[in-house]
Amino acid sequence: MAVASKVTVIVVAAGKGKRMGRSYNKQYIMLENKPILYHTLAVFEKHSEINEIILVVASGEEEYCQGQIIKKYGLKKVRKVVAGGSERRNSVKNGLEELEEACEVVLVHDGARPFITKEVITKSIEVAYEEGAVIVAVPVKDTIKRVNEKMEVVETPERQQLWAVQTPQVFRSGILKRAYKEAEDFERVGTDDAVLVEAAGYTVKVVLGIYENIKVTTPEDLIIGQGILNQRKDGEQCEWE
């Protein structure tokens, strides 16, 4: 009998979030009386196409997450909690090592992005099955300048070609594993998973995301995040075009 393919999400929550100005990990800050990380995990917990979640947290926080988030809120799809590394790519690599052989598609998502929607997740999985590699992104709204070390403008790229990349980033598992193996072999670095996949020779497709899918990074983001939750409770979707 053939083994059914799985869709796994690696939720990366190992960063300390120094820009938040807190003494503890930003993913544990409360929104609506629940940790940000809970809100993120709950989206994937409720998604019918997600079979399991691998949660990557800062070293030493594994037991806390098991007790205070996973067990406390009854999250059944979190199969494994693993310690992250010194950099994001190390944390993702640790998560990849926990993938089961049956996993065909893997999503990588920031633990501090709790406002991703079911619809965007579904579309990104669909495209990943078809194309192999996909990122979620939105067109930039502002004019972007390249600036040198003297604080001089050196270039103004065409805004129509610029997209702000979010997560999840979604791949056939074999593609992402190969990209990370080559990154290790050739000492490649990148700020996201797609950079490593591109460097390995794959084409990465783009799925249109939503502007609400912010990464909660600064105190101001908490205010915006509360506004998003309030809008959603009222059955609305924020339109910040």
UniProtKB/Swiss-Prot annotation:
Class of enzymatic activity (EC top level): transferase
Record-level GO BP terms: isopentenyl diphosphate biosynthetic process, methylerythritol 4-phosphate pathway
Catalytic activity: 2-C-methyl-D-erythritol 4-phosphate + CTP + H(+) = 4-CDP-2-C-methyl-D-erythritol + diphosphate
Swiss-Prot/TrEMBL site (Positions MEP for the nucleophilic attack) positions: 159, 215
EC number annotated for this UniProt entry: 2.7.7.60
Keywords assigned by UniProt, alphabetized: Isoprene biosynthesis, Nucleotidyltransferase, Transferase
Metabolic or biological pathway: Isoprenoid biosynthesis; isopentenyl diphosphate biosynthesis via DXP pathway; isopentenyl diphosphate from 1-deoxy-D-xylulose 5-phosphate: step 2/6
Sample GO molecular function, one term: 2-C-methyl-D-erythritol 4-phosphate cytidylyltransferase activity
SUPFAM superfamilies, A to Z: Nucleotide-diphospho-sugar transferases (SSF53448)
Task of the protein: Catalyzes the formation of 4-diphosphocytidyl-2-C-methyl-D-erythritol from CTP and 2-C-methyl-D-erythritol 4-phosphate (MEP).
This protein's name: 2-C-methyl-D-erythritol 4-phosphate cytidylyltransferase
Organism name: Alkaliphilus metalliredigens (strain QYMF)
Upper lineage: Bacteria, Bacillati, Bacillota, Clostridia, Peptostreptococcales
